Every structure is written in C-alpha cells, then in structure tokens.
Amino acid sequence: MILITATPGGVTSNLMTYYAKGDLALSISMTSFSTVLSLFFTPLLLSLYCAGVPDISIPVMIIVQTMLVLVIVPLIIGMSVRSKWPGFAAKTTKIFSLLGIIALLFLIITGILSNLHAFADTERHGVLFYTMVLSLTALGMITGIILPKLAGVNNYQTRAISLESGLRNASLAMAIALLIQDLMGDFYGSMFVTSGMFGLGMYIAGLICIATYKKILPVEAEEVR
C-alpha cells in the first residue's frame, strides 16, 4: 500500500482528464510536478515506513535509478519536444498518450499473469485486502473533489484534480517491486499484488468518472479551453 501511494501520477490521469473534459494543462502540470518530487520522496517514504520492519532492506539507489529511467528521462524528453515543437506535440499528444495507456495496461496484465502464484495466497490476499487496495482510488478521487470544491475551485479544474489524486503510476510501482523483490523478503508478494490490482482498478474507476463527471461536476462551455 505504501509503495503505490508513494508513486507519482502518470500518463493515465492525463488521458482520463482529456476524455473527462477536464483541465488537461493542469493535469499535465500536476503529473510533472509530482513526478519530479517522487524522485526524492518515493525512496524516502519507503525507507521511513519500512525502517522498523525486520528482514527488509530498501535499496534506495535501485529505486532512484529505476525512476530516472522509467519516469524522469521520458518526462524531460516530452517537455523538450513540447517546448521546441509545440504544434507537433499538440497533434501527437493524444495518440502517444493512448498508445502509452495500452502499453501500460498490457504490462500490468502481463505482470499479473506471470505472478499468479502471489495472488493465490488467499490467506494474505483476502477480500479485506482487495477492498482496501481498490478503495485507494475511490478515496483519492473523492478527496480530490471535496477539497477543491471547499476551496472554491471550478468544476473544470476539479475534474483534473480528482483524477490526478486517485490515479497513480501503477506500472512504475510494479517495476520497483520486481527489481527489489530479493531484498523485500516475504513482503514482495503483497507489494506486487497491491500494485497490479490498483493498476486494474484505476482504469475502471477512471472510466466511471468519465461517465459520471458530466452530472456531478457539470462544466460550462466557456470554462473549457
């Protein structure tokens, strides 16, 4: 649970925001900001929360290197392309975002299928476990609606904030879990299962939001830019 909550947002939230007709620029900005911060906070939070757990060693450098390759470098490339060729970036963003979603979903499903033995541990991964994992997305999205509305944020931006709050980079969490499994002992199975189930659940939650935001967060035509 700590691993998935410590990871940043990803391209999924950006694409979902686009289809939900939310503030895409805000979504991309939040994703970029959280991604940069995660390079420091993801290994830090894992180290702090696992400090008192026996037989657990958090490989900080491995986590940082993984995030640099899978998250930071692509982010820098994307921002550079958007800065130098804004027209090209605007035309191809939706296409590459959709391809990225398909690729990430494929990786999540493939990872789950190749680690079915971890899911078979029903004593550890029972109904309560899956309920807690799947409720993370719902809790994040609900909080992402309530707090902005209390602060007077318009519905157009609230849609983006809600999706950004509930959706995480599950593929990054799964990659980290796989790379550090030898150092995590008995906790590896739970880390991987949590990340995989969250990854599948967030796609379903995102589609539900796209279908319901029109009613619960109506947007005036002049708000959409």
Language-model regions: role of each:
Residues 1-225:
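Alpha-helical transmembrane segments of multi-pass small-molecule/ion transporters
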